[in-house]
Amino acid sequence: MNKLFEQRMQKLLQNDYPAFESALNQKPIKSFYLNPLKHGSIEHLNSAFLTKHPYINDAYFYDYENYQLGKHPYFNCGLYYIQEPSAMAVANCLDFDHDDYVLDMCAAPGGKTCFTASKLSSAGLMIANDINKLRDWYFILKMLNVLVFKIQL
């Protein structure tokens, strides 16, 4: 760990720093959610490496050391989207109606945008600014209610 960062965190967290340091040394938790627009199902995936997310519908944790979901053909077809649990929680907690217009000014890498758009109906619109010209998740996931701009602010 960078010494300057470590010193700053020790000063900021004080007595809570050991818990923070311990958390940094834990194995990361990986997750994904099923794309509702593809009517995906986990039946096609190896359930031995999957655990249902306790709070988010159609979301699962997976053992990334033994099951490489990012290399699976269903990932490239948009059946599911791999996303960190903390990022998934943000979009899941947003209070919006299914026909709202939602603006994401910092849509890189696009996971929260995709998750939010999947919760909107066809009457809703997700407007995203994603500066990566090579990224096409919205197309792969067949999200027709997403309008993407590539504006560097």
Predicted feature residues:
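S-adenosylmethionine
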Residues: M1-L153
